Each structure stands twice: as C-alpha cells, then as structure tokens.
Amino acid sequence: MPRAPRTYSKTYSTPKRPYESSRLDAELKLAGEFGLKNKREIYRISFQLSKIRRAARDLLTRDEKDPKRLFEGNALIRRLVRVGVLSEDKKKLDYVLALKVEDFLERRLQTQVYKLGLAKSVHHARVLITQRHIAVGKQIVNIPSFMVRLDSEKHIDFAPTSPFGGARPGRVARRNAARKAEASGEAAEEAEDEE
C-alpha cells in the first residue's frame, strides 16, 4: 500500500538581520556558557519559545472566563511546569511571556549533567552524553538537547553499561591494566631469580 508523503516543518528560524553585532555577541556567550555545538541550537529554542509566547499572547487577549483560555492556558502552564521552565509559584500566563531562552537551555540534559557534577565541564557533559554514558532512569539518552522533566531530574546518573557506572572497563583501560599486570608479573619473576 502506498504511503502518504511525510511533510516536515521547520524547527528553527534564522534571524532577519544576520550580522547584528549585539545579537551575535549574546549568542556566542550563550553557546559558550551552555556548551552548544552551533547557533542553530539557540535558534531552535528561540523558535519554540516564540511559539509558546504567541500562544500565551493569543490566550491573554481572550476573556478570563473563556473556556478556550481556561483549558488551553492551564495545559500550556502545566506543560511548562512539568519541564521545569516555569516555577510552581508562577502559574499565570503573564509569567509565560517573561520566559527567556536561558530558562530552556537550563533544562537541557547537557546542562543538568554538568550541574549534578557528573562532568567536569558542559563540553565534557556533551561528550559523556553522546558516548552513551548517561541514563535518565533506566533509559540511556544520547541526545544533549533532551529536555529533562522535573520528576526525571533525580534519576540522571551514569548508565549501568558505562565504565563510569561500574560496568566493564573500556578497551584502553583494559589494555593498561593488562600491561600493568604484565609488568608487575615480570618484576616478581626478577625478584625470584635474584633470590
């Protein structure tokens, strides 16, 4: 049976003015602070944020007792609280408009791994994640931009299959251990020969 073609939608939008120096400096600072690979990661989050803010603005124009505003507004706020972008004491649509890109970047797995002290830097955190050393609960996650929910935050740890999580050491560590054992074995033989 023929399958319908899948339509893809754009996940980011580039800035209208490509060489605005103040924006370029701000993006570079963000990319360095959160260990991002490229500017597209910033554009993707700002695109998501703009869609969320647009929805909040649309709902704020409606009457407070409007069923659509009540239903969709609560759903939007609940989703943002679950991800941890919006705090429990700020459950109003006005606070949704005050959200910044940094609030979303804070919730990335890469940032959370660094904040929990599992990595020496945000860049090291990215390497650990892409090399499948990090698990959220029982699931290995190898996507640095994975959005960590509030209830999943306490389950971030090294994967059970990772050498950092107590599994079999890596290839280089095994080779070094074998060399060390071989060297200590030779030293013991030489000591026996001298006696």
Curated annotation (Swiss-Prot):
Cross-link (Glycyl lysine isopeptide (Lys-Gly) (interchain with G-Cter in ubiquitin)): 180
Principal localisation: cytoplasm
Pfam families: Ribosomal_S4, S4
Cellular component GO terms held in the UniProt record: 90S preribosome; cytosol; cytosolic small ribosomal subunit; nucleolus; small-subunit processome
Ranges of residues in domain S4 RNA-binding: 107-181
Region feature (Disordered): 161-195
GO biological process assignments: maturation of SSU-rRNA from tricistronic rRNA transcript (SSU-rRNA, 5.8S rRNA, LSU-rRNA); positive regulation of translational fidelity; ribosomal small subunit biogenesis; translation
Keyword Ubl conjugation in record: yes
Record's keyword annotation contains rRNA-binding: yes
Molecular function (Gene Ontology), one example: rRNA binding
SMART domains: Ribosomal_S4, S4
Entry keyword set: Cytoplasm, Isopeptide bond, Nucleus, Phosphoprotein, Ribonucleoprotein, Ribosomal protein, Ribosome biogenesis, RNA-binding, rRNA processing, rRNA-binding, Ubl conjugation
Secretion signal, residue range per the UniProt entry: none
Compartments reported by the entry: Cytoplasm; Nucleus, Nucleolus
Positions of modified residues (Phosphoserine): 184
Other facts noted in the record for this chain: Present with 63300 molecules/cell in log phase SD medium. There are 2 genes for uS4 in yeast.
Family annotation (PANTHER family): 30S 40S RIBOSOMAL PROTEIN, 40S RIBOSOMAL PROTEIN S9
Family: Belongs to the universal ribosomal protein uS4 family.
Physiological role: Component of the ribosome, a large ribonucleoprotein complex responsible for the synthesis of proteins in the cell. The small ribosomal subunit (SSU) binds messenger RNAs (mRNAs) and translates the encoded message by selecting cognate aminoacyl-transfer RNA (tRNA) molecules. The large subunit (LSU) contains the ribosomal catalytic site termed the peptidyl transferase center (PTC), which catalyzes the formation of peptide bonds, thereby polymerizing the amino acids delivered by tRNAs into a polypeptide chain.
Subunit structure: Component of the small ribosomal subunit (SSU). Mature yeast ribosomes consist of a small (40S) and a large (60S) subunit. The 40S small subunit contains 1 molecule of ribosomal RNA (18S rRNA) and 33 different proteins (encoded by 57 genes). The large 60S subunit contains 3 rRNA molecules (25S, 5.8S and 5S rRNA) and 46 different proteins (encoded by 81 genes). Interacts with snoRNA U3. uS11 interacts with MPP10. Component of the ribosomal small subunit (SSU) processome composed of at least 40 protein subunits and snoRNA U3.
Protein name: Small ribosomal subunit protein uS4B
Name of encoding gene: RPS9B
